[in-house]
């Protein structure tokens, strides 16, 4: 049953779907009240079934955590998201959005009317400014969003796994001044985030746990699912 005071977060990865239910203290600190996760392990040859399996995992989590009718804020895996950092000249704030749209047209590898995109301005460094562009194909986001909604949830904020991880780190360690490297090893990709003095840089590498499983399957001439269980 929906509770307007709780915050539901959903993380949709390639082989794992996780959900957390949070509450806020009087000082706006977040407390994790409940958490559950489901594996979505598929042979790469059955990729067409992934969205259906993700939906089944979401349905299980909704029931287990009793969040039917809640608003879910969710993140999508870095592999499906395009991220680019762009440098901007010193401009009035009124000109920034127009310039960033121009930069998005140059850098995003799809027509802008086919993607959902947004940007965030990073702290200024001298006269130069920098922004991070984030984009995902609209059809991919719509398919995932529809799947989530079909399992007794409505959707709220959407983020990508890379920036979600960075934001979680900054919120958890607000006084940290030393440079840090965050590494998230997923099934299909590995995300690297370098953070220093309020600025961050990201790189997503197309290498993850699924490649290890596939190599084991080939080496021992067994099925992908058997290799995954080893």
Could you tell me what each predicted segment is?
Residues 1-38, 72-75, 171-212, 216:
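Gly/Thr-rich phosphate-binding beta-strand-loop-beta motif of the actin/hexokinase/Hsp70
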Residues 19, 29, 46-47, 76, ...:
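Switch/connector loops and helix/strand junctions flanking conserved nucleotide-binding motifs
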Residues 33-64:
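N-terminal phosphate-binding loop and adjacent alpha-helix
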Residues 42-46, 142-165, 197-230:
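Glycine-rich phosphate-binding loop plus the immediately following alpha-helix
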Residues 58-71, 222:
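Phosphate/pyrophosphate-binding loops at sites that engage ATP/ADP/AMP, CoA/4′-phosphopantetheine
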Residues 71, 75-171:
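Active-site neighborhood for divalent-cation/phosphate handling
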């Amino acid at each position: 049953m929906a509770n307007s005071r709780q915050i539901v977060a959903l993380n949709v990865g390639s082989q794992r779907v996780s959900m957390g239910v949070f509450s806020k203290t009087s000082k706006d600190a977040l407390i994790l009240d409940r958490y559950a996760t489901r594996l979505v392990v598929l042979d790469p040859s059955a990729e067409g079934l992934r969205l259906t399996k993700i939906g089944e995992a979401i349905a299980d989590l909704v029931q287990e955590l009793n969040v039917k009718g809640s608003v879910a804020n969710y993140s999508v895996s870095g592999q499906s998201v395009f991220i680019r950092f762009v440098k901007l000249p010193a401009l009035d704030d009124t000109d920034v959005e127009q310039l960033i749209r121009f930069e998005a047209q140059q850098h995003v590898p799809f027509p802008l009317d086919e993607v959902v995109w947004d940007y965030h301005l990073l702290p200024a460094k001298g006269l130069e400014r920098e922004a991070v562009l984030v984009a995902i194909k609209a059809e991919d986001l719509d398919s995932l969003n529809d799947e989530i909604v079909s399992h007794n949830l409505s959707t709220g904020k959407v983020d990508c796994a890379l920036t979600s991880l960075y934001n979680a780190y900054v919120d958890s360690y607000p006084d940290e001044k030393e440079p840090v490297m965050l590494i998230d090893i997923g099934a299909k990709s590995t995300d690297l985030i370098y953070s220093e003095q309020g600025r961050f840089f990201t790189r997503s590498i197309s290498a993850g746990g699924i490649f290890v499983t596939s190599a084991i399957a080939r080496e021992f001439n067994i099925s992908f699912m058997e290799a995954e269980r080893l």
